[in-house]
Regions:
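A beta-strand edge to alpha-helix "cap/lid" segment located at domain peripheries
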Residues: 53-125
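Short hydrophobic/aromatic segments of transmembrane alpha-helices and their interfaces
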Residues: 18, 34-36, 92
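A solvent-exposed, acidic/Ser-Thr-rich amphipathic alpha-helical stretch
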Residues: 4, 23-76
Length: 125
């Protein structure tokens, strides 16, 4: 049984790795048959750890930082709002999604959906 503390720790670890980790490290947080839809309604759903690895590989060499704004855990699920700032000296942008994750009994992410659109993207100087 996964606890509220386990899920809270997993979300914090996820945000830490999205900011500083590799695609391998982020993908390891997911169950083998997990799904990622980011953004929801954006077309492609990444199915399986290998596809999820490919998704996160896209940001691996880009400067980035994350900040958690709010987190709610209920049952085996977490919903959280955070911001991710990506880019470097050539320009930065901040995205403010709300993510919903479902966890299995081992604490692995089985589903992640990110709710955002261009309306939640800010160009930074």
């Amino acid at each position: 049984m996964v606890s509220v503390e386990d899920i809270t720790n997993a979300v914090n670890r996820y945000l830490e790795l999205v900011a500083t980790g590799t695609a391998d490290e982020i993908a390891a947080l997911y169950a083998e048959d997990a799904t990622v839809e980011d953004p929801v309604g954006g077309g492609e759903v990444h199915i399986g750890r290998q596809a999820i690895h490919g998704f996160y590989k896209n940001i691996e060499n880009i400067p980035r930082a994350t900040e958690l704004h709010t987190l709610r855990v209920a049952g085996h699920e977490a919903a959280f709002m955070f911001s991710i700032t990506v880019g470097g000296d050539g320009g930065k942008m901040r995205i403010e999604p709300i993510d919903v994750m479902v966890f299995n009994s081992e604490g692995k992410i089985t589903s992640m959906k990110a709710y955002w659109s261009p309306a939640y993207v800010t160009t930074l100087p």
